[in-house]
Amino acid sequence: MSAQPVDIQIFGRSLRVNCPPEQQDALNQAAEDLNQRLQDLKVRTRVTNTEQLVFIAALNVCHELAQERGKTRDYASNMEQRIRMLQQTIEQALLEQGRITERQGAQFE
């Protein structure tokens, strides 16, 4: 489906953005999250300039994203190691099973 205009409120300002209908709930949730972040920053930092608050919030979000990307990379690397270990274990078990089968076959001859 094509994007449709959606009105959202960010820190007291109205914004109209285009958004696919199936993503409107996510957009509204993101707007609520941003509003909460801006409000929390305003209280914590005592900064009243909205533009500064938006930049600080953007930097915080970028930092959080970088941390999550690092966690994802670490997790993927860990899973790759585990998969390699499992693969080696399976290959070793199959080789041993093959040797056992060969020995048993030789006993019957």
Swiss-Prot record:
Keywords: Cell cycle, Cell division, Coiled coil, Cytoplasm, Septation. Residues 21-99 form a coiled coil. GO terms for biological process: division septum assembly; FtsZ-dependent cytokinesis; septin ring assembly. InterPro entries: Cell_div_ZapA-like, Cell_div_ZapA-like_sf, Cell_div_ZapA_eubact, Cell_div_ZapA_N. Pfam families: ZapA (PF05164). GO terms for cellular component: cell division site; cell septum; cytosol; plasma membrane. It comes from the Bacteria. It is found in: Cytoplasm. Belongs to the ZapA family. Type 1 subfamily. Homodimer. Interacts with FtsZ. Activator of cell division through the inhibition of FtsZ GTPase activity, therefore promoting FtsZ assembly into bundles of protofilaments necessary for the formation of the division Z ring. It is recruited early at mid-cell but it is not essential for cell division. This is Cell division protein ZapA. It comes from Pectobacterium carotovorum subsp. carotovorum (strain PC1). The gene is zapA.
